[in-house]
């Protein structure tokens, strides 16, 4: 009895020590990943605040010693006197992104709800086409998209950046999976009470689908805000360029050395909206990713 009594506390201490060591290694790994992921963002913030004499100092500095907002001032004032002001690029990105997100949410939710709850003729083949579309990269469909947009005479317009991204297969599939969890008993009860279909969709289905369409909105915002390839293909006018193309314009050409601080500020302004949107909506995104279905 004495031997067993002495052995159990010792084994318990070894277990606690082993558990503490494994947890320490886990935290160490997570901290390393945070540093690796956060270091580029930290360098970007410092570079946007660095005066010109610190940007080209040798050896290079990661941490800014004399922070200044001069780079942002030059970006929004000095460059605004050029042919296309930088604020125009911000407006182009904001307008095309917001319009795309709003239309995409409505179209994908309506399409998925109608396909799942009303089951029209050919709903099976339609869903099969959506699944097949998930297998292709967006770059594969750029040439067909360009041919369609060119046929509609929408090249070099805002609609060229909006229409091809309205009905994305992944967004449709995401909402469709949530629509399958909508309890039919609630919808039937509303119909028995005399509710019209548009009322059922907007007042009952959409609130229940909020985790799905908020996640759709976040993904759509981030993808469209950071999209470089589509504006490069569809847009040739400087007045219609978005922020990713504006960064390319600022980073090259004559006087690029003098604009280095402004380029850092432009990079900061381009990156921050995506981070803020995801940080604000991360709760809904995590809820959707965990697929917390609606119980009847």
Language-model features, listed with the residues they occupy:
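A hydrophobic, multi-pass inner-membrane permease signature
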Residues: 2-296
């Amino acid at each position: 009895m004495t031997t067993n009594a002495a052995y159990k506390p010792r084994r318990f201490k070894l277990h606690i020590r082993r558990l503490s060591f494994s947890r320490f290694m886990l935290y160490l790994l997570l901290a390393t990943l945070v540093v690796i992921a956060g270091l580029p963002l930290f360098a970007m913030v410092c570079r946007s605040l660095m005066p010109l004499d610190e940007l080209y100092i040798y050896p290079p500095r990661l941490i800014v010693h004399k922070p200044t907002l001069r780079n942002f001032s030059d970006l929004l004032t000095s460059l605004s006197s050029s042919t296309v002001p930088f604020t125009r690029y911000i407006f182009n990105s904001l307008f095309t992104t917001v319009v795309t997100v709003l239309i995409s949410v409505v179209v994908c939710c309506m399409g998925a709800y109608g396909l799942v709850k009303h089951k029209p003729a050919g709903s099976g083949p339609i869903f099969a086409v959506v699944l097949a579309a998930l297998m292709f990269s967006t770059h594969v469909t750029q040439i067909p998209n360009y041919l369609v947009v060119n046929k509609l005479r929408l090249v070099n317009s805002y609609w060229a950046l909006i229409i091809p991204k309205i009905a994305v297969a992944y967004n449709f599939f995401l909402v469709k999976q949530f629509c399958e969890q909508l309890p039919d008993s609630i919808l039937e009860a509303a119909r028995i009470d005399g509710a019209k279909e548009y009322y059922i969709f907007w007042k009952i289905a959409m609130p229940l689908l909020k985790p799905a369409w908020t996640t759709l909105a976040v993904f759509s915002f981030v993808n469209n805000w950071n999209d470089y390839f589509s504006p490069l293909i569809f847009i040739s006018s400087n007045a219609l360029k978005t922020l990713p193309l504006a960064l390319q314009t600022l980073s090259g050409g004559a006087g690029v050395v003098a604009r280095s601080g402004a380029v850092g500020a432009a990079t900061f302004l381009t990156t921050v909206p995506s981070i803020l949107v995801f940080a604000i909506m991360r709760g809904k995104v995590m809820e959707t990713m965990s697929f917390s279905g609606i119980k009847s």
